[in-house]
Every structure is written in C-alpha cells, then in structure tokens.
Amino acid sequence: MNSIKFPVLDRTTKNSVISTTLNDLSNWSRLSSLWPLLYGTSCCFIEFASLIGSRFDFDRYGLVPRSSPRQADLILTAGTVTMKMAPSLVRLYEQMPEPKYVIAMGACTITGGMFSTDSYSTVRGVDKLIPVDVYLPGCPPKPEAVIDAITKLRTKIAREIYKDQIRPQQGNRCFTTNHKFLIVRSTDTGNSDQELLYPPSSTSEISTETFFKYKSPVSSHELVNSGGV
C-alpha cells in the first residue's frame, strides 16, 4: 500500500470496507504509474539517467521511461533550454496526454544558470514556456534530490481534485531574441508540414501573426538547418 496519506481512503469501517471517493481512487492509481519522458539537453540528464541503475532503482516508484510524449505523463526538463529548442519543448508538452506534470531539474532549467548572463540564445526559466509543478535546483542535482522531487510530486498528486487535473487550454509562449515572451496561438495545429519562421536579421522580435506559417512540405534536414538564432 502506498505511504501517501489519503484523508478519505484511510477511513475504514470495522468490517475492513474501504470508503473512498473518485478523486482519491484516481490519484492513488496514478501515484505508482508516472511515466517520464526521456528529455535531456545537458549534464543534468546524466544524473537522472543514473536513477535507472540498480543503486537507486526508481522502478520501485512505478516510473517507466518513455521515448514518446504521447505515452508519458511526466517530463523532467534536465539541462539548458535554448531559444531554438523552445518550440520543440512546447510541442512535446502539448503532445502529452492530460493530466501531465513537469519537474524543472537544474539551475539552467529554472533560471538559465550560468548561461543566462548576456546570452541571446538561452531561455531564462522553463516556466516561461510550460507550467512547472516541482522546482529542483542544483548544478546538477543529485539522484537523491530527484527522488525527493518525485516524492513531493506524488504528494501533490494525492491532494488533487478531479476537476483541477485537466488544466485549461492556454496560449503558448512565444519568445524573442531580447528575452521578451509573448502569448501566441497553440503550436499543435495538426499539420506536420508546418515550418517555424525565425526572425529576420532586421528585427529582434518574432511577430505573433507570423510565428508559424504554412509552406510547402520540406525535409527534416532543411528544417533543422534553416537559418535562425
């Protein structure tokens, strides 16, 4: 039985009949089935990868690493998030099914870290792009700290209310080269052929109207090697 305390689930009758609610039952079933998305951009991910070994054995918490965002409900943003990587991170988050959770792992993810000083290409805080449930500071955090963050997230899940599990649909955060973040329309348009337009050299901001533009299909090689910051 899970050690997380449930106010209603813990009330039992003399005949050992458990009385509970839909909220507690749903939360209890998800506590031991968090499937994290393997997402790492820097050295913090090495500490997270060490949890898979037998020394820390994070399988005991029911964590099953997934390579597809459509099969994951937890993402640990481990490492530096660059401006060019930001749209991909937002898209991965949008492809995850609800309810979903985010753990910001490391100083570079939370504030930009040492790369945030006079840097034009680093996002200064992943919470400007996606909502964060647990902040895990460190450079890098130890595996024990990651386990503690997961424990705190499990405690938060145990206290959730069913109607609050589905977050309201929000506009995504658009970014500019001078670190001004704007709210734009959703990037999950269902069109796999859309191409990201980077700002021209004559301006420092990405227009909210031309953030995404539908163009003729392009190869992934051309898309990756397109000009930009």
Curated annotation (Swiss-Prot):
**One CC-aspect GO term:** chloroplast thylakoid membrane
Q: Domain of life here?
A: Eukaryota
InterPro entries in the record, alphabetically?
Answer: NADH_UbQ_OxRdtase-like_20kDa, NADH_UQ_OxRdtase_20Kd_su
Q: What is its main location?
A: plastid
Q: How does it sit in the membrane?
A: Peripheral membrane protein
Can you tell me where the transmembrane regions are?
none
- Alphabetized SUPFAM superfamilies for the sequence: HydA/Nqo6-like
Q: Which Gene Ontology terms cover its molecular function? A: 4 iron, 4 sulfur cluster binding; iron ion binding; NADH dehydrogenase (ubiquinone) activity; quinone binding
Per the UniProt entry, the Enzyme Commission number(s) are: 7.1.1.-
Kindly provide the name given to this protein in its UniProt entry: NAD(P)H-quinone oxidoreductase subunit K, chloroplastic
Which species?
Answer: Aethionema grandiflorum (Persian stone-cress)
